Amino acid sequence: MLRIAEEVTTALEEGRAVVALESTLISHGLPYPHNLAVAEGLEAEVRAAGAVPATIGLIEGVPVIGLNGNELERLAVGGDRVRKLSRRDIGAAIVDHADGATTVAATMALAAAAGIEVFATGGIGGVHRGATHSWDVSADLTELGRTPVLVVCAGAKAILDLPATLEYLETQGVPVVGYQTVEFPAFYTPHSGLTVAAVAADALAAARMWRIQRRYHTFAAPGGMLLCVPPPERHALEREAVEAAIGRALARAEAEGVRGPAVTPFLLAAMAEETSGESIETNIALLRNNTRVAAEVAVRISELG
């Protein structure tokens, strides 16, 4: 059922480093042609660090591990025709022969099915603010608890309830590791006031943590690991400014009655307006940084064997 690119298959068979990349950024994150340029740039970051990129998505109902250039462009220009797929949506998309962009949860599931251990993304989903009333909790969190993939990110998206998200990850038994930081990043800013469970000083330390977790998965964490990389300092936003912008964005969402899956894209778009586009620049910068770190960690994992 999976179609795995020949380059990816060869790398996996030879024990070389492969990094999975999601595709929702392409179809739902940025306008064309910026989305395509960023996607191609992320793949270039992986290659520059010595690993093989595997951007994941569905093309005409077929899960593809390693989209080619034409397929990347197909998702980039597809607009509303391209479905946003979490794990629960994959089956229906296959039946309907639909094109689909994969979220963190879906990308993790497909990466694991293909034998890929490392995945780079911007920020994971989490517990939404007001979840005590809405019960809006991202499937990314439960996926991390059950699927053995090391996810490299800049924490959870800042629009979320970060303390509750960390509590949920603890409940799921997911190690939250800071990359050269003791503080859980808040996506746009390195500062959240929240601490991580462990710290990796470099890519080799992160790789060793992951190898030990997988070796002893019967009594250590059986699922994924979150490696949290602060956004690059020169692109990071001030914590106070971020919180103020989020407050205004949340008020707009409430006033307009935005609910369900529409909440996150609405809030991210509102954040871009509230910050005069700075949040988009930060998002792209942290994506590139996370991807580079993920590739370096993947190379170290392959060297450990």
UniProtKB/Swiss-Prot annotation:
State which gene encodes it. psuG
Family classification: Belongs to the pseudouridine-5'-phosphate glycosidase family.
- Protein origin, superkingdom: Bacteria
This protein's UniProt keywords: Glycosidase, Hydrolase, Lyase, Manganese, Metal-binding
Q: List the catalytic activities from the record.
A: D-ribose 5-phosphate + uracil = psi-UMP + H2O
Q: Where does Mn(2+) bind?
A: 136
Name the chain's protein.
Answer: Pseudouridine-5'-phosphate glycosidase
* An example Gene Ontology molecular-function term: hydrolase activity, acting on glycosyl bonds
Which enzyme class? Answer: lyase
Q: Record keywords: Phosphoprotein included?
A: no
For the keyword Nuclease, the answer is: no
How many and how are cofactors bound here?
A: Binds 1 Mn(2+) ion per subunit.
Q: Whom does it interact with, and what assembly results?
A: Homotrimer.
HAMAP family assigned to the protein according to its UniProt record, in alphabetical order: PsiMP_glycosidase
Biological process, per Gene Ontology: nucleobase catabolic process
Q: EC number(s) of the enzyme?
A: 4.2.1.70
Q: What SUPFAM superfamilies does the annotation carry?
A: Indigoidine synthase A-like (SSF110581)
List, separated by semicolons, the cofactors it needs. Answer: Mn(2+)
